[in-house]
């Protein structure tokens, strides 16, 4: 993992806008930009990251997910989850590794915010992100 020296150097690059972590979502990039712009309190709404809900493996041994949204009328049938390149179904191990990296990005943002004296508050009910302090929605 990161040594304290590399984390410190990384923060110097981040403060100058010369580097960032491996962020996996536009939300994370938005948080980073807000911190660069000097915001000291960032509140998240609607960022649930329920990427593990509805996971299953079908009879063809493909990783699938029943992706649900608040506007759906009912449950959706699980669909295979495909990698972008190459366009093949994810394996469980690859998918979980990518999801873990996504959540690690939130920990990096939390630590970077703290180094600036800023706070990130997650106000999303049911969110799976555990890196930030919680607040009522």
Which residues fall in each region the model found?
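Polyanion-binding loop/helix "lid" in catalytic or ligand-binding cores
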Residues: 70-127
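Short, surface-exposed, charged loop/turn segments at secondary-structure junctions
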Residues: 48-73
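Single conserved hydrophobic/aromatic residue that forms the stacking wall/gate
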Residues: 2-13
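Short Gly/charged-rich anion-binding patches and loops
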Residues: 8, 29, 108
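Glycine-rich anion-binding loop/nest that anchors nucleotide
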Residues: 19-30, 34, 39-57, 91-102, ...
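Short, aromatic/basic amphipathic alpha-helical patches
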Residues: 109-111, 133-136
